[in-house]
Amino acid sequence: MSLLLGQIVDALGGSLQGGSRDTPICRIAPLQAAGPGDLSVLSHPRYQQQLAASRAACVIVAPALRAAALARGACILAEQPYAYFARATQLWRQHHAPAPAPGVHASAVLDPTAQVHPTASIGPLCILERGAQVGAGSRLQARVTVGADCRIGARCLLHAGVVVGADGFGFAPEDGQWIKIEQLGAVRIGDDVEIGANTCIDRGTLQDTVIEDGVKLDNLIQIGHNVRIGKHSALAGCVGVAGSARIGAHCTIGGGAIVLGHLELADHVHISAATVVTRSLTRPGQYTGLFPIDDNARWEKNAATLKQLHSLRERIKALEQALKAA
């Protein structure tokens, strides 16, 4: 089922240039792979060379690229082309694969005290334990578990296999064995949060683990007990956040990175993939803590040198002092 360019512009705004509102769009496609019935996007000026060769019926571009876009055909001018593209994908999904109707699937298991908003959707084999709450317009896909007293805000999307409110990892040592610390807190998830498949968010020990409004979590993420993640932060796949860490608002954490427990990240901190965050970061900025990849022989030599870095530094300082004294 196609959409007309006019329908897209009417729904999303922007300015259609050099094309007809009646042009049918059959799919949304990457710039270099797009065909005559496709809508595409030029998300960054560095891809401008692909623009002239693209066969797309229409391309979403920034106003600064209007002339280059019109030289090849129709375009939609948008101040933020990538955000416009994102909304176009949402519009496409609404027309071609609408969200499930509100309600609770017959195979879901809900404690009698669980509360589900009438506009929420609970998918197959979901479990909502005692006192769990799901807010307006939220969607839980298959096999999501929401533990006792945990709360999901409005318009959230939890993908298959998410577990909210499992016990945090808390044990006290005594005489060579471990004594379990019961996790008496819960999890509070704000509005407009998306949580990827098989991600786990542990309940707090005494206070709640908190995921604030607009946070986006990828697949296979582990969020430890008592963690707090600030508004509109985004964490990529396989990130691990240890207990009691606090991540500010508008932060990003790349795939496979680890944040150690009890650390604090300021607002607007950006962590590169595979970085291990070992100290609190109080200033906004991009941080990387990764030994660069190399062929194995060179890597081993560099690693061996790194182990001796302190002694080499002391030798250089001694040489500098000797030269000054000479």
Curated annotation (Swiss-Prot):
List the pathway annotation: Bacterial outer membrane biogenesis; LPS lipid A biosynthesis
Query: A single GO BP annotation from the record?
Result: lipid A biosynthetic process
Highest taxon of the lineage: Bacteria
Question: Which EC main class describes this enzyme?
Answer: transferase
Family matches, as Pfam families: Hexapep, Hexapep_2, LpxD
GO CC terms for this protein?
membrane
Question: Could you give the subunit structure recorded for this chain?
Answer: Homotrimer.
Q: What is this protein called?
A: UDP-3-O-acylglucosamine N-acyltransferase
Specify the species: Verminephrobacter eiseniae (strain EF01-2)
Q: What is the lineage of its organism?
A: Bacteria, Pseudomonadati, Pseudomonadota, Betaproteobacteria, Burkholderiales
